[in-house]
Amino acid sequence: MSVDFNTVASEFCNFYYQQFDSDRTQLGNLYREQSMLTFETSQLQGAKDIVEKLVSLPFQKVAHRISTLDAQPGSPNGDILVMVTGELIIDDEQNAQRYSQVFHLIPDGNSYYVFNDIFRLNYS
């Protein structure tokens, strides 16, 4: 059975951002020890270090709004590349911050985990 990579990408991003916005401490199950996060200029490897970084971000409340979501098959092995752009509403501020994020998803049984995660705020 063929996987609809667009559906997987959309469902993954909806779940990821809902979890991020409600309780970042619970994101660890989406990463593995070989996973890597580049957050602005910081690079971290391993689920524990990645979650520690995300939890340490200097805001209490955040809401992600996806503007665009593009996906492609990443390899014949079922990997999926996902590119997201959107807006962050931080601590109920009026002005949203624009961001870009790339996920490289790897199949893991009946689900996927994040192998690579690259996040950047977009300043203009």
Swiss-Prot record:
N-terminal signal peptide: none
UniProt GO BP: nucleocytoplasmic transport; protein transport
Protein keywords: Cytoplasm, Protein transport, Transport
Domain NTF2 residue range list: 8-121
The organism's place on the tree of life at top rank: Eukaryota
One Gene Ontology cellular component: cytoplasm
InterPro entries: NTF2 (IPR045875), NTF2-like_dom_sf (IPR032710), NTF2_dom (IPR002075), Nuclear_transport_factor_2_euk (IPR018222)
Subcellular location: Cytoplasm
Presence of keyword Protein transport: yes
Alphabetized Pfam families for the sequence: NTF2
PANTHER family tied to this protein: NUCLEAR TRANSPORT FACTOR 2
Function: Facilitates protein transport into the nucleus. Could be part of a multicomponent system of cytosolic factors that assemble at the pore complex during nuclear import.
Name of this protein: Nuclear transport factor 2
Native organism: Debaryomyces hansenii (strain ATCC 36239 / CBS 767 / BCRC 21394 / JCM 1990 / NBRC 0083 / IGC 2968) (Yeast)
